């Protein structure tokens, strides 16, 4: 971006200066509306989410057999909710900032099959595509026991079709593993940030991995191009897919059920704050949409990004969405949080969700490493760096009197609050890689 343009952008949006300086930044969204007001802009409804629930239920008997690790949950891919009181104390001590309310961790990091939040959206979209093809071919009805998809004739049928996706790692992992299991030929276009072990794991499942020297945007573009030349190839578009988004959104009702089981209340007197790491935006966007449908105006969602990849904060704050990238303002998009190394946000997610998000913040790689170490020490839970992005959120909210005043939160409401940090990945990180992460924390 030329200097004159850059100066006028900074004049209009002074916060951009802090982003360019790679400062850890918090922006509370002044454009937040009620759910009723913001929902029409999403372009999806409660019914769409119910359809996704129903589809995942139809596939549950298949998943329980195809992936024995899901048998105990009856083929439902869901993660545990954990209280992390020792980590809460550690954060308060390290940052000299009390966190009022209770801190919980949503362990999508340990979801079965692919060990990340992408096991929600990625697997869902592959299943939705397989169902569509099988229904159209007359091989399946909605009333069937879907475990029949494991038979050789279905494998044979699906092998005529292929799936392609561009990814920094975790989405590729979930789509690759699922597609290969169903019988699709699958190609994952991996950006320069992708970890070697993720590529190796995909190849071990018979997935074709194409590697790029450039970032996520290039991998997606190349994947899209390659798929266009083959009518039997389906491209899963992380930047624009409504199907992926709906796969994530199912988490809202599921969390509501987990809360009900624990007797945890979410209402005006007991607000819920949720902190979601954000890359291109599909995962956190879909989850936040589902949470809003489940808890209405009593849930407050925040997106967390690396200081080197603040694409969604930049896009929503300036209103330019996918018309601006972090590279345009001189930021390099290089971060240890490989799952969040995205320079240009999803325009679909930004425009759909900008009224339903309470805020955005950035944190440095070092902060993620520090918290990664503390969580391992205090709670014995090991995550990858990206998954710690949400952990900085509770301090930011508890430290901002102006945010609390705008929303009219009393001290008592904050004492009764639940702070939920969405841990997005790390359950499958190899031991030696994890030890390298742990060594970087202070």
Curated annotation (Swiss-Prot):
Family of this protein: Belongs to the serine/threonine dehydratase family. DsdA subfamily.
Annotated gene: dsdA
Keyword line: Lyase, Pyridoxal phosphate
Keyword hit for Lyase: yes
EC numbers on record: 4.3.1.18
Subunit structure comment from the entry: Monomer.
Catalytic activity field: D-serine = pyruvate + NH4(+)
Classification lineage: Bacteria, Pseudomonadati, Pseudomonadota, Gammaproteobacteria, Enterobacterales
Pfam families recorded: PALP
GO-annotated molecular function: D-serine ammonia-lyase activity; hydro-lyase activity; pyridoxal phosphate binding
Organism domain of life: Bacteria
Secretion signal, residue range per the UniProt entry: none
Protein name: D-serine dehydratase
Organism of derivation: Escherichia fergusonii (strain ATCC 35469 / DSM 13698 / CCUG 18766 / IAM 14443 / JCM 21226 / LMG 7866 / NBRC 102419 / NCTC 12128 / CDC 0568-73)
One of the protein's GO biological processes: D-serine catabolic process
Top-rank EC class of the record's enzyme: lyase
């Amino acid at each position: 971006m030329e200097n004159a343009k850059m100066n006028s952008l900074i004049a209009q949006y002074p916060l951009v200066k802090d982003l360019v300086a790679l400062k850890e930044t918090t922006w509370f969204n002044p454009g937040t509306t009620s759910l009723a007001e913001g929902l029409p802009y999403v372009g999806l409804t409660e019914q769409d989410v119910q359809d996704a629930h129903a589809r995942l239920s139809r596939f549950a008997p298949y998943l329980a057999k195809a992936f024995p690790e899901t048998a105990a949950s009856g083929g439902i891919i869901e993660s545990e909710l954990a209280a992390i009181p020792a980590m809460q104390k550690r954060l308060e001590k390290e940052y000299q900032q009390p966190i009022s309310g209770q801190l919980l961790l949503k362990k999508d990091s340990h979801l079965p099959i692919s060990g990340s939040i992408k096991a929600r959206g990625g697997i869902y979209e592959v299943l939705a595509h397989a169902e569509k093809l099988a229904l159209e071919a007359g091989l399946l009805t909605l009333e069937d026991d879907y475990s029949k998809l494991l038979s050789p004739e279905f494998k044979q049928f699906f092998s005529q079709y292929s799936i392609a996706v561009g990814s920094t790692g975790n989405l590729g992992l979930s789509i690759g593993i699922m597609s290969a299991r169903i019988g699709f030929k699958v190609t994952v276009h991996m950006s320069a940030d992708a970890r070697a072990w993720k590529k190796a794991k995909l190849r071990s499942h018979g997935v074709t991995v194409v590697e790029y020297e450039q970032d996520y945007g290039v991998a997606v573009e190349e994947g899209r191009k390659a798929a266009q030349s083959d009518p039997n190839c389906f491209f899963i578009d992380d930047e624009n897919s409504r199907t992926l988004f709906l796969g994530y959104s199912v988490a809202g009702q599921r969390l509501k059920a987990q809360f009900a089981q624990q007797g945890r209340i979410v209402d005006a007197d007991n607000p819920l704050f949720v902190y979601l790491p954000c890359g291109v935006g599909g995962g956190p966007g879909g989850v936040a949409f589902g949470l809003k449908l489940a808890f209405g105006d009593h849930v407050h969602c925040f997106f967390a990004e690396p200081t080197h990849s603040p694409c969604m904060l930049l896009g929503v704050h300036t209103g330019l969405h996918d018309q601006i990238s972090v590279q345009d303002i001189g930021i390099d998009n290089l971060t240890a949080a490989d799952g969040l190394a995205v320079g240009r946000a999803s325009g679909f997610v930004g425009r759909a969700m900008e009224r339903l998000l309470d805020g955005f913040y950035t944190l440095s790689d070092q902060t993620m490493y520090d918290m990664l170490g503390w969580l391992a020490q205090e709670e014995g839970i090991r995550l990858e760096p990206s998954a710690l992005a949400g952990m900085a959120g509770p301090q930011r909210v508890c430290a901002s009197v102006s945010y609390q005043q705008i929303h009219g939160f009393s001290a008592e409401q904050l004492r009764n609050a639940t702070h939920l940090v969405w841990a997005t990945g790390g359950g499958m990180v190899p031991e030696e890689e994890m030890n390298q992460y742990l060594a970087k924390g202070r």
